[in-house]
Structure formats: structure tokens, C-alpha cells
Amino acid sequence: MEYRHLGRSGLKVPVLSFGTGTFGGKGEFFSAWGSTDVAEARKLIDICLEAGVNMFDSADIYSAGSAESVLGEAIKGRPRDELLISTKATFRSGKGANDVGSSRHHLVAAVDAALRRLGTDYIDLFQLHGFDASTPVEETLATLDDLVRAGKLRYIGVSNFSGWHLMKSLAVSERHGLARYVAHQAYYSLVGRDYEWELMPLGIDQGVGAVVWSPLGWGRLTGKIRRGQPLPANSRLPVTADMGPPVPDELLYRVVEALEKVGAEVGKTVPQVALNWLLQRPTVSSVVVGARDEAQLRQNLGAVGWNLTPAQVAELDAASVTTRSYPYWHQQGFLERNPNPV
């Protein structure tokens, strides 16, 4: 397994990390992802560790906290210092007026609750799940800085931020000498390349590493969805599609056909090629892969240990290109002084 620095930090993370969205299976939405129990989670974690994948990502809203609880039970008895635990909070976690957001009140409570569920006394990477415009950035970062100094958090990051959200936060950290975000858990895939327009250049400039979520385009790049064919019987898309990233059908089919062609050339599956393409992009520190079962996990792990050729990368780039929104389409006219990162 290859390990990379998480952004500009000294922490090294595996290029593939394991997501626990399938753990617990509470509620219609998360049960459509999976319902992995503790026994099965232990097996999946064993496979991960054998392959060198030692970072496990969760969130307080995954199955209403059950995903963190299952992860905590599944890692019991393992050397804690050999594991990297990543989790998130900010979204609503209860019915109370303060059970949401990035206020001091909510973040302190959310971190303590996560530590209890995970059965640990520190979190390696804690990320805000979204931007809270109702709480001053200074309050949020001062709270996270206190939690880092208290030893409850090792590193901090964000998820699903706009460019200005992240840049303002980094400026506040620098101005006040507060803990700095080193990671941005962002959506990025061959059928969703918007990350490249603003967030990737920011990550390069500011040393913020990407931890990629949904690298297979919300389950669309599994190799099971093809032009002119119905969705697989066990697809989660009928239940979850409205909550995920929009993907035009023609773009999806064009990308899948390119992935199949390249996959045939290198002897790899559609998802393995899609993941390997991501691993060659700037700023990407780790790609979060999930799995309902051992077979899915082993297939995803086959995305490392080899590389697409520059010609194959260019072919996938061409198949996945989309129309840029403003101001990014306008900036294409001044690439002489403002080049694209890829």
C-alpha cells in the first residue's frame, strides 16, 4: 500500500481508506447502503489491514451513530496506534436547538459522543461535515483548536466546503494561530469533476489534501450500469439517487464505455480503473472506498499497485469532460497565466 502525506501535514495516510457508511444499516437511506454488523465489520477490517489500509472513515449521522459504534466494537483489541480513525460532525444529530452546526456547544458534545461510540480517547482526523454559516468561523476554529490541545483530536479537516468557505477558514487559522485544516473530504469522480475547478487549485496552493468520497459516482461506476440495460436488482440508486450527485445519463454511459475499453487493455475492472484514475490526480491524499461484502472490498483494493498510462488517463479525461460553469469557462481563455491543474 502506498502512503501519502495528508495535505501539508506530517501525517501519512493510505491512498485507499475504508468508509463505514454500510455499517449499522439504520433507516431506509443507510440500510440501502448496507447493514454490516460487528462480526462482518471485523472481517472487512482484517482484509483492510492485511492490505495496508489502516484509515477508517465514519460520521455521527451514519445510521444515527450506529456506524461509529460498530466500528468501535470491530477494532477492539487492536493496537490503537496502528489505526487512523476519521469521523465527521456538523449535520443535525438530534431534535434539540443546538444539536446541529459547528458551534462550540455542538462540536464539544459531538466529539465526546463520537469518542464514546468509537471506544477511544482520541480521533485522528475530525472533519466538519458541512459549512455552518450561522456560527462565526472564529468560534468553530477556536473550539477545534481547544479540542486538539486537549488531545481529543489529532488533525482537523472539512467536508463539502465551497472554495471561499475553506479559504476564509484557513485565513482565520493563520490570523489567530489556530489549528489548521489539512484535509477536505470532497466528492470527486470521473462523472463528477467539479472539484478540479476551484477546490483542487486551492488544495495545491494551500496544502490541503483531498480525501475523496463516493469515488465511483454514487455507485454508478461499478461496471453494472450500462447503456440500454436496467439497473441491477440490488442497486441502491432507486432509494438514494436523489440524495447523491446528479449525473447525466449520456455522460455516465460515455464514461463507462471508456472505462470498459481501458479496463480491457490493462486487465482491470471498471471500478478499479476509475479508482486508479483518481489516485493519479493532484491533491488526492486518500480515496474512501466502501464495501457491502468481502468480494467488493477485495475488488476495490485491486485499484492499487499499478498505474494507468498517460494515454489512458488522457482518454478517460476526454470521455468525462463537461461544460464548466462561470467563471471557470471564462478562465479557459487565459490559461497562459492561469493554467488548469490537470
List PLM regions with ranges.
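Terminal-tail/helix-coil boundary detector
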Residues: 1-2, 205, 229-265, 280-284, ...
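N-terminal binding-site loop/beta-alpha segment at the start of enzyme catalytic domains
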Residues: 1-83
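Conserved, mostly hydrophobic/aromatic
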Residues: 6, 18, 41, 48, ...
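Short, well-ordered coil/turn segments that N-cap beta-strands
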Residues: 11-16, 52-55, 79-83, 119-124, ...
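Glycine/proline-rich, positively charged
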Residues: 27, 33, 94-198
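Generic structural signal for well-ordered alpha-helices
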Residues: 45, 68, 72, 111-115, ...
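Glycine-rich beta-alpha junction loops
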Residues: 89-91, 162, 188-192, 214-221, ...
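Aromatic-lined glycan-binding groove of carbohydrate-active enzymes
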Residues: 195-235, 269, 341
